[in-house]
Amino acid sequence: MLHNYDDFGGGKMQGAPQVPRNTLLSVDQQLQLMNTINNMVRASQFTSQLANTIFTLCAQLKTSGSMLEQSHKNELNKVFTSLRQACCRDNGQLGTPCRLKIMELVELRAMNWRTNLAHSQYYVNRPEGQHDPAPTVGIPPSATSPPTQVTSSVTSPVPSSPQPPMQFVPQNPMMFQDPMAANHNAGGIFFIPAASTWMNPLMPMPPNPFLPHSMIPPDHQMFLRQRSLNKKPNNLMNKTLQLRHEMIIRNSDSGKIMGVKGRRVAAVEQLTNTVISFQKVDSKSKERTLTITASTMEDIERAKDMIIDTIRRNMSPMRTDMSIPPPNQYSGMSSENQSIPSQQNTANIDEDDDDDDEDIKLEQTSDGKLTFHCDDPELLAAAQEALSAYLRVRARPSAEEREKKKERRKSMPLQQTARDQQEPVMLKPAKTFHGSTPNLADGLAATTTVVVASIPQPMVPNVHASGDNPIRYNRDTLMTARDTKRAPIPDEMLQEINRVAPDILIA
């Protein structure tokens, strides 16, 4: 009888009578077997009924496993989880044949329920599978019934030849070869020990009793050893030779070669076909070791040069495929020009491309930025460095300019060369600094405008202009000069004043 166990109480419930394992069960009956296994494993009831159910389920899933995989995948996952838990929780009660069935079931599902000849022969040729793998022992109706009421409730497949029954104690538990073990006859016959059995085992069963290696035929062992020795040279020859080189950089330059989220070092690895690894060092360390791995020494040298160049420029490595393509100058050609032979067109295009590659265009945007346009990245970088060097030299004043600036800083009165000559004065709004952030003053100064005020120069007598006495102004002279209409100033003088006035006002 098939005994089902509830989830909590663990009590027995009489079910439908069992059928032979070779008979295909319905889907509901197979699901009932799965639930029985789940409940018994959850209740830690590793009895003969659990072994019988596992063997029956294995025989059914060999035929209908692929169908249940599509329709009842969750139930299959649950029962396989229970089988794994049963192998971990039991203390040897399941035995080797039951574990073999579980392993066969797991491998069969891993192969998408498609068995092959090697898989079938392995489990057929196992010594544990040559006899009845699950001799079923019925559970007595009560715990006090005599052992003579033990009956078999499930019929096993008919073996090809009569075999000795399965024994709980192995013939050779210490895995020693004993020639007299074949003539030894077992005493008690039972497969899985229950809580109250009529025979106690002679010794505890090992947790995982696999077959010893000595039971493999000697000729088969020699064949396997020769085959493994023959495979070793082939594996060594198939491996590609990898070269490794170490270079030392400053720890402060690690960020330059690493880039944001490792993009720069990834670009170097992609361009040079190498693998670059960084040594893990302390943040206070001054040096750091880079390990470059590649198949050829040329790739390692190119990677080293690219790393040094990336650190020096503090820019990502340049890709050749990212260069700007030259503009097509022949898009507007007429039909007459398009009839020229292809060889002449190719030659002209190559010449024009060479000329365009050497051409650099410098543009100034509305916000005052300078923009370079060139097709050659190297030429563009050289032009950028040349312009930067020129601006640095240009911004540095010479010795003569520094002397002139010192002279202009002195507060000396302006000499009047002509009687009616008048000069404008540049009035610039004063900068006010707020707190400790002078950048705010720069922003305010950027929004202000320069005010040019015209202040007429005072009219002084000729005696002061020609004499050696210094020029002095009183209140009456200044008031008279304010009301006097001044004469227009020539353009040349205005340009000169505008050129000199900023240096004087800044000083």
Curated annotation (Swiss-Prot):
Pfam families: KH_1. Residues 349-360 have a biased composition (Acidic residues). Residues 329-348 have a biased composition (Polar residues). One of its GO terms (biological process) is translational initiation. It is found in: Cytoplasm. The keyword Protein transport does not apply. Residues 126-163, 314-360, 395-424 are annotated as: Disordered. GO terms for molecular function: eukaryotic initiation factor 4E binding; RNA binding; translation initiation factor activity. Keywords: Cytoplasm, RNA-binding, Translation regulation. One of its GO terms (cellular component) is translation initiation complex. Gene3D superfamilies: 1.25.40.180, K Homology domain, type 1. Residues 242-307 form the KH domain. Residues 140-158 have a biased composition (Low complexity). Its main location: cytoplasm. Plays a role in promoting translation. Interacts with eukaryotic translation initiation factor ife-3. Binds to ife-3 using a bipartite interface in the C-terminal domain which comprises a canonical helix which engages the ife-3 dorsal surface and a non-canonical helix which engages the ife-3 lateral surface. This is Eukaryotic translation initiation factor 4E-binding protein Mextli homolog. The gene is mxt-1.
